[in-house]
Amino acid sequence: MDSYAPTQALNEAKTNADPDRFWAVGFPLLAVLIFLMSTHQGIGILPDSARYMNMAATPWDAPVYAAMLQLVALTGIDIVAGAWGIGLVLSGLNAFLTWHILRVASGRATYAAMGTALVVIAPQTVALYGLAMSEPPFLTAILATLLAFLRYVQSGDRRWLIAVGVGIGVASLVRFTGPALGAAMALFLIIDPRHDAKRRVADVARILIPSAVIFLGWAAIAAEVSGRSTGRPLEWLGNMTAREWWLSFNALAAWIVSDELPAVMRRILFLMAMSASLFILVRHGRSVLGRAANGNAEASLIAIPLGFFFFTYLGFMVLATAIETNLHLNGRYAYPIYCTSIMAVTIAMAQVNIADPVIRWLHRALIGLACLMLVSHGIRSTVRVHQAWQEGVGFASLDWARSPTLAAVDRLPRDAVIYSNGSDAIGYVLRRPARDIPAPFMLRTGRDDPNFPYRVQLAGAQAALARGNTYVVFLNRIDWRFYMASEQELIRLLRLVPVAKLEDGTIYKGSIKEERQQ
């Protein structure tokens, strides 16, 4: 019997390794397949995408994704093709990292597979990975930071905390919400029972110093070189009302099931799921911290900073909405904590002791909810992928490619000056520069631009129109830029006359009388 034991152990290890390999390869392949189908008409382009690609009049803010695109473009590769390539790589990489972290931290392949599936096939994931946006690289930075933190928890090697700090600094330059991850990590280090108070403070410093040097160093250099860094004044300019907060809550409730279900049902399911998840996370946290105090450090400790991240991120977003005008906590901004919350609950559920009847009942309820979410996610994501396959997304959609107004703009002289409410659409579809039409106030502040006041914008546009070979283009599909002057207002103030009126827009120029007077 003793001679057989090593062989039996090897066979069991091989049996356990086989499903691990399957999921480690299967999830990245699934993510890549979804990406390829979603970008059948080209990677989706939204207004922020055009900013990252320098195809819009408004510059980008956080620099990392824009730098990635520009570095690819320097090789001679088309920048849009570069964005597609980056998206392809990150879709597979992030799926693998999610699986790997969950597998190591949970210790159970079935739970890790369930958690990874809830991330990979989520409609938010499908939508955002099919776009040239900063969310995929932001999640890569988060996952890489979590992986470094996991190595620290397992080994106790404090050099990994330096890597964590670097990861947080980089994440903060991908999206400015990155510091919330650092706050979550710091909270865990402060309560880590394995070390005394002096060591805990020193460990917090190990992640704080490199992350602060990276972020603040960039901000100082950017302000010196370009005169701007985060692109936001540090003032209390937020204007979210109770209605906007309610809409933000509804965006979070859509994590669970489709918007097509009654709103009351979605809200109740979300609150029940959050309450049950928090209960299990707290129970798991108390248990695993107790074992850590006795010198038994487990990988599942990482569920604690993941749980903290939900609150630090929401706190950061509340602060951001208080500072910036017209900023709402929509599905895009909430996406990172969807992923990390799923990971936290997955790890806790895999490790929590279900001997307690209450925990056992909640555990079963959450498993049932996860199955419901998988079905809902699968249906919604299939619909999204099918629509993206047929029509494309954003400015890369067939509607924009077939726009009669853009076709007419493309026939204008190549040296013509163009003002438009859709300078980004013109920049992407036609690959020619365009300026924004005058705006009475700025989107982020609700105030007139102190560096380029509305009256100066109007005077500049009027002078350009008077010189001739200047056109103002209004695209009817762009109806969300309420901070820009209306079409009727500019017709009156700039004395515009129509050159071409088409089904999806109008092209204007200055009046001949005005030009002759100049």
Report residues per predicted region.
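Membrane-embedded, lumen/periplasm-facing catalytic core of multi-pass transferases
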Residues: 49-56, 149, 366-427, 450-466, ...
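Membrane-lumen/periplasm interface segments of specific transmembrane helices
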Residues: 34, 41, 202-283, 306-317, ...
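Transmembrane-helix motifs of polytopic, lipid-linked glycan transferases
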Residues: 85-106, 140, 144-148
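Extracytoplasmic catalytic/substrate-binding loops of multi-pass membrane glycan-assembly enzymes
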Residues: 40-52, 58-71, 77-81, 225-230, ...
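Membrane-interface transmembrane helices that cradle and orient dolichyl/undecaprenyl
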Residues: 14, 104-106, 145-161
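Perimembrane helix-loop-helix junctions
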Residues: 4-6, 151-155, 181-212, 285-292
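Signature aromatic-anchored transmembrane alpha helix within multi-pass, membrane-resident enzymes
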Residues: 28, 110, 208-212, 299, ...
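Short acidic/glycine- and proline-prone juxtamembrane loop motifs at membrane-interface regions
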Residues: 130-137
